[in-house]
UniProtKB/Swiss-Prot annotation:
Keyword Transmembrane helix on entry: no
Native source organism of the sequence: Oryza sativa subsp. japonica
UniProt name for this protein: B3 domain-containing protein Os07g0183700
Positions of region (Disordered): 94-152, 191-232
Biased composition (Pro residues): 100-109
Keywords for the protein's UniProt record, in alphabetical order: DNA-binding, Nucleus, Transcription, Transcription regulation
Subcellular location field: Nucleus
Record-annotated DNA-binding residue ranges: 336-434
Amino acid sequence: MPLPSCRRREQRPRQSCFQNPECHLRLRARQQRPQESAVQSTLSSSIYFSDHFVLTPPPFQITPTSIQNSTWLPIPTSPAVAAPPLPRCLGGVDGEGAPCAPPPSPIPAGPASSTVSAASSAPATRDYLGGITGHRLGQEDDSGGHEYTSVSGIHVPSSSGVAFVSFGQCPQEVISTDLCLGLGPIAATAPLQPPPPPAAAAAAGSPSATTPEPGHGEATPTTSSSAQFQTQAQQVTRDMWMACAAPKSGRLPTVGSLVYYFPDGHAEQCLSRPQEPLPGRIFLCKVTDVRLGAAATNEALATISLVPIAADDHAFQLQAPADPDPAPAQSQSLVSFVKPLTYTDVTKNRFMVPKDDAAAGVLPHIQLNDDVPLRIKDLSGKEWAFNYTWKAHTRMFRNGWMEFSNANGLVTGDNAVFMRRGNGEMFMAVRRTRNRPAPFSVEEVIEAVWRAARREPFEVSYCLRQDGDEFVVPRDIVDDGLRARFAPGMAVNFVWAVEDGKLPTIGPQGEVISIENYATSIGA
């Protein structure tokens, strides 16, 4: 005999509050508003357990708690570092109101119908121009004859100077972005003043009187690298440095080559920006030394010694041949693989090895259920011990990975780089995400800019990131980008440097709306 409906309801298994999402919401509302919890619980229970009656609860509104009682804390910001004002010739505060140099002759503009397709997803083939964002400068043609240009502001050479092309998101918006790759607005600068002769400098008591002329003396740069980025005893070869660099991003100049130094790109690596604007110009320099080492954060570090030269010093601008010293034979067979770190990799004591041939060529071959001890050196020479195991079709590092992760401050988005030489020696390094600035001091950037303006030798430290953030760029790469022909109305877009096998990242889009002339934007 079937039971009455009331008995059937009584024999139903009751759900716990954690199994019933509606009960979970009622408990949360009860904690927020205790004065209304009883009414809300009664009405909700009647609605849920009654199959024959539908009760409509009286409407009421839950008001949020006062913002004064909230526990949110303000986000700490990096303190701005006070920087000494730049001289008038650098376009600092003293030169903001200075008249700009007379505009040069008209710049040959491209055809008005030439546009840039922003929907193209094919990776670009030309080299990336470094700086803050690593945007591409130049023109390219695809198979269909369309013209592609990716810029964030460009200086185009003319007969008596350099003309700057700016672009905005709409015709009503005028954005004056510095060349050099999204570096901020350009201030009108006075023509550059030549440095005083040695005799005049000695009479005035200038400390630069004892500095030999660039390229004709043995002056040693006094700019010191950051204390946190000291070169270790471990030998970091050129191919190891390139393995740690992002594809199409990392680039090392050779000794004797000509490069452009971008001050704003250098300042982009600092934890805080200088209060005073840096000069809206770049410096032509000659590379005198390149030293490779390891940073304290297990990143590949390059210390580049530069000597500024004048644009009209043709004898000193002769390009030197490439480094004659060949790479060691053991480093020529270097193999490597890169693994982007996931949330599990940085929070648990295990590192999931990717299932590809590159990882198999670096790590030793193991069988299922094997547990092999590994010893791998970082770039500073410290040895780390791991257990390399294969469980349930998954290869991983255990027993030691968490110690390495905490010691290097790994976060989601960083990349772990594993390398192996021909003699079986293994190394590992870290390639940081581009959102984490390198802890360089602002004082280093300011000192480098001052020395570049006085044409004194100086040093810069370059800690590579995932994007084209280099600020010491070969001269031919910059000159190729400056030969692009732009005209008002031409569509442009941002393109970020990408890794091999991935589509390029297309950023904001806009169009060229004006061409402004700055005859003193490039010089030394």
